[in-house]
Amino acid sequence: MGDAALRAKWDRASRLYDWMTWGDIHRFGPAKRRLCMAMQGRCLMVAAGTGNDFRCFPPGLDIVAIDVSSEMVAQARIKAKAYDGVLEVRQMDICALDYPDGTFDTVVTACTFCSVPDPVRGLRELRRCLKPGGRLLMFEHVRSRIGPIGLLQDLMTPITRRFGPEMNRDTVGNVLRAGFDIEREENVYLDVVRTITARRPDTA
């Protein structure tokens, strides 16, 4: 999928995005808040969508939130006004971040890498923009290691990718391939929804 098609896909999705994700917001909000408690320093949130996860951020931080969709960004900017801290929302592609190397202390993702067309490239770009020792905090849908569930995800993915995520991504493997060290994994729902804490090595 080209860049223009990707933007158009998420522009269309923005119209019903809050309605489609209402259940997840309430179901997974506590897990996201626990993950976000580790945010520190200058922070980047990628694929922010309409900004529903802004409520999970600790107060008083300096945060940039990006999304590829101009329609998502427009809605997210409205929600950003309620944040108790600095929260700038920009339209930007995760695979071409307009920031110098080592800009951020923390990067946050929430259901992001089930949708990025080239996930390893996107993760390498996040690694570039993190300071050495900086942390990547991820809340993601991943492919199950339980055989029947993983197979079901494989069968569902050709359908789900038409309107949003790919359900069978090996996100943990992709994080390692991008050059991160994984510090912690935690299952949130079975092993399909998972939090991952990773770190950019100090010497790389």
Question: Predicted regions: what is each one?
Answer:
Residues 44-96:
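Class I SAM-dependent methyltransferase SAM/SAH-binding core
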Residues 4, 20-24, 137-195:
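C-terminal alpha-helical "lid/dimerization" subdomain adjacent to the S-adenosyl-L-methionine
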Residues 196-204:
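C-terminal lobe and adjacent flexible extensions of AdoMet/dcAdoMet transferase-like proteins
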Residues 95-107:
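A short acidic, Gly/Pro-enriched loop at the edge of an enzyme's catalytic core
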Residues 106-118:
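A short SAM/SAH-binding and catalytic strip from SAM-dependent methyltransferases
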Residues 1-40, 52-53, 75, 151-158, ...:
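Conserved class I S-adenosyl-L-methionine
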Residues 120-132:
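A short glycine-rich, Lys/Arg-flanked "PGG" loop and its adjoining helix->strand segment in the class I
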Residues 62, 133-135:
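Short glycine-centered segments of the SAM/dcSAM-binding site in methyltransferase folds
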